[in-house]
Amino acid sequence: MSEAEEIILCGIEHAELLAEMHSRSFAGAAWNAKDFLELLVQKTNKGFIYCNNRKPVGFIIWQEVVGEAEILTFCVDPDFRRLGYSTNIIAKLFEYLNQVSVNKMFLEVSEDNIIALSLYKAMGFVEIARRSKYYHKPDGSTVDAVIMSADI
């Protein structure tokens, strides 16, 4: 990690910032500050904000339970996409999880989120299941959720 990069552990004091960043990434489906507060008060949920030159560029929130973790939400600000931050954030999460003896990671992603699917596959995730018609789109259509896992 360069001197310009910094990891900040998420706390309840970051709920507004997380909600703002989430809304820029998930228009129409964003979580609000209350949602993040409810997540962050649970002991099994953790997260960090990835900053570059003191500017928050993305964050990831996950849940840890008995040697496994699940990504609950993850985003990179649209202004900072395609610059390698997504890969850096997941790599930092893997480093952390390895240190705390988590050996399996799970996530779910919309089957039409091709960029995210490509990233996750490149980071070692494989599809293990699907949830049929799980995500509802604004036009009324549905898409499957792809459940993926990776060994840490």
Predicted segments, located by residue:
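Short hydrophobic clusters on alpha-helical segments that form packing/core surfaces
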Residues: 93-97, 105, 116
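Terminal substrate-recognition subdomain of acyl/acetyltransferases
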Residues: 140-152
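Short amphipathic helical patch at the helix-1/turn junction of helix-turn-helix
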Residues: 76, 110-111
